[in-house]
Amino acid sequence: MSIRDWPEAERPREKLLEQGAAALSDAELLAIFLRTGVTGCSAVELSRRLLSEFGGLRALLEADLASFCGHLGLGVAKYAQLQAVLEMGRRHLAERLRRDSILESPQAVRDYLKARLRHEQHEVFACLFLDTRHRVLSFEVLFQGSIDGASVYPRQVVKRTLAHNAAALILTHNHPSGDARPSLADRQLTARLKEALALIDVRVLDHFIIGDGEPLSLAEYGWL
């Protein structure tokens, strides 16, 4: 049955307009993005099939071009459209951060870091550089690969901090495994960077580790 033949209250688009996007299932949201299904399969049915094939919404959103286009109903145009939507979301979060002090919008920090790092397939270490009022000056990826004490150089972090004339930093890196619990190396690295930055009177406010759930704050656990 075509979605046009469904009761109006059950159609994804009408449901979104009436109840808000949060009321929709992953399949319903994806159906609105796809707009149409394929022969013998409505957009919602196709969405359910795709979510099953990918193993969930996150895997679909993070798929590379070859993987994405290897599924029925998806192609290069849809991939480009999806990347544009995701990038607009990241830029919206970045603008939220730049408007206010990060102390006034801590959830915005978490949301932004999740959007920037969760999709990375390899470990990435980055910094949010802040001014004296704790407003964001810049977000910068500094190191990629295996993030440990041997691969992250305090000298380079200090150099970029001085270049931005930053007064404080938030450190962050991701765990592609999805487990955000910090390793001993993570905690030792944080201590080394905090010590190096203290020499130039710059504070490390937090170190967030990005995994599958909410970002883990080392400061909240007393590890900073």
Swiss-Prot record:
PROSITE patterns reported for this sequence: MPN (PS50249), UPF0758 (PS01302)
Molecular function terms, GO-annotated: metal ion binding; metallopeptidase activity
Gene Ontology biological process: proteolysis
Location of the MPN domain: 102-224
Entry-linked InterPro entries: MPN (IPR037518), RadC_JAB (IPR025657), RuvA_2-like (IPR010994), UPF0758 (IPR001405), UPF0758_CS (IPR020891), UPF0758_N (IPR046778)
Binding annotation for Zn(2+): 173, 175, 186
Keyword annotations from UniProtKB, A to Z: Hydrolase, Metal-binding, Metalloprotease, Protease, Zinc
Pfam families, A to Z: RadC, UPF0758_N
Motif JAMM motif location, chain numbering: 173-186
UniProt similarity note: Belongs to the UPF0758 family.
Protein's UniProt name: UPF0758 protein PA5319
Organism whose genome encodes this protein: Pseudomonas aeruginosa (strain ATCC 15692 / DSM 22644 / CIP 104116 / JCM 14847 / LMG 12228 / 1C / PRS 101 / PAO1)
